[in-house]
Amino acid sequence: MKTISMPDKLTPSQRSYCMSRIRGKDTKPEILVRRGLHARGFRFRLQERRLPGKPDIVLPKYGVAIMVNGCFWHGHKGCTLATRPKTNMEFWENKIARNRHRDEVTTAHLEALGWTVITVWECELKGKETGEARIQRLAEEIIQAGERKRQQEAERKSSRAEARKERERMLERQAALEAEINALYPIPKRIRKASKE
């Protein structure tokens, strides 16, 4: 299907200037979320470069990575803020599809690394009551994720301790067996030493 592109009302330099003003970090939705979390006592890192996709907000203590997404740029389905421009539609469809694909890949990669990924959409923060309610839900999600992380760490720690005990028991059985064999069949010390090397 061929799309009809309408002429841009701005000159190329004006359009370039407008596009350059669009921020990739420290956006209004991000700042709202950060203020809300900070007011509730959460401490976090911003734009963590060591993680895939540089999540907007990272809470290492809770194992949570938060993506604060603009509805337009990340293609929030069913959202009025995500309406596509009527000009150059093919370009915008492809761009937003690539953004959504990148978001999915980043989320999968972070989850594979053991992080809980929470996405907060721009439209969820519109309006004072709605925004506060979403930030409160976000705080609850973070606490739940932290509890899951602590539980998983405790399980890993206990399984490592159990594996360590099993190894010690195996070494004890092996030493007892060697002692029994040495009692039944005396082997000179130098030969035993050479066989272990």
What are these regions (language model features)?
Residues 2-119, 124-197:
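Nucleic-acid endo/exonuclease domains
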